[in-house]
A protein has these predicted regions:
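C-terminal catalytic "cap/lid" subdomain
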Residues: 1-77, 81-266
Length: 266
């Protein structure tokens, strides 16, 4: 919460839900909370970049310890995976990341992912965990990405949750209210930005809450939050990586003939 206290009931619920999902899904958990729980140990915390890095370094082991505690009754080991933006922008590093996660899944280990705030380059940081989760989902060719939010879903102008969105268009974008979480960096604008990216690459996205007893199961059956339908995509894995994980370093201008050849995949 805003005072830096981790809600054990939420962690317990997340662990229980994921334990059930593992029967049919390979799961990656991207978890916030490190900075929020670690800032209690930073005197006169003001939220500067250096203080956030220090708070994350203190909070990450606390968070992992709790996940270990609540996954333990299900005999499920967890792994801490601290990522940086270059792990996705570098194709070779990304492929190594995929191999490691494949090893996790083969051994029934749940990877718990967060940004490596302590050493992350300021210019190449993730904008927030919404971006990190989206890059994970796209890079690992996920079927579904569930993004949790305190408001329980994507709301219209009357603060009513919209249960189904077929496409993120100008009408949907018009409902976005600016503002960020008091605990993290992301807000609904960020969530919708990365939802649009994920759905454009063929991934179903659900923005939902954690208030029900079985929030993930409810989300997957359309009973919790807002479901954003995936758009048709014929892109191969490398093309999806180029569309999401790679970083633009420059531009090339081509003439009409070259453009036609590229569009025809020649």
């Amino acid at each position: 919460n805003s005072e830096g206290v981790i809600d054990h009931d939420v962690i317990r619920k997340v662990a229980s839900e994921i334990a059930n999902l593992l029967q049919n899904y390979r799961v990656v958990l991207v978890s916030s909370g490190a900075v929020g729980s670690g800032k209690l140990h930073i005197k006169n915390y003001k939220g500067t970049l250096t203080e956030r890095k220090a708070a994350a370094a203190v909070g990450n082991p606390k968070l992992i310890q709790l996940y270990q505690q609540y996954f333990s009754p299900f005999n499920i080991p967890v792994a801490q995976a601290l990522c940086e933006r270059h792990h996705f922008s570098s194709r070779s590093q990304f492929l190594q990341l995929k191999d490691t996660f494949a090893c996790f899944w083969e051994n029934d280990i749940v990877p718990i992912v967060n940004e490596n705030d302590l050493v992350s380059n300021v210019e190449l940081k993730f904008s927030d965990n919404d971006e990190l989760a989206t890059l994970m989902a796209v890079g690992f060719d996920a079927d579904t990405l569930i993004i949790c939010t305190s408001v329980g879903g994507f709301m219209d102008d009357n603060n009513q949750i919209i249960p189904l969105v077929k496409k993120v268009d100008s009408t949907i974008l018009g409902f976005v209210k600016t503002g960020k979480s008091t605990l993290g960096l992301g807000g609904m604008t960020s969530k919708l930005t990365f939802t649009r990216l994920a759905t454009s690459l063929g991934i179903k996205v659900i923005i939902g809450g954690l208030n029900s007893d079985t929030p993930f199961a409810d989300a997957l059956t359309g009973k919790n939050g807002t479901t954003f339908l995936p758009q048709p995509s014929n892109l191969k894995a490398r093309q999806k990586w180029l569309a999401s994980g790679s970083i633009t370093l420059g531009s090339i201008t081509v003439d009409k003939g070259a453009a036609k050849a590229l569009l025809q995949r020649k």
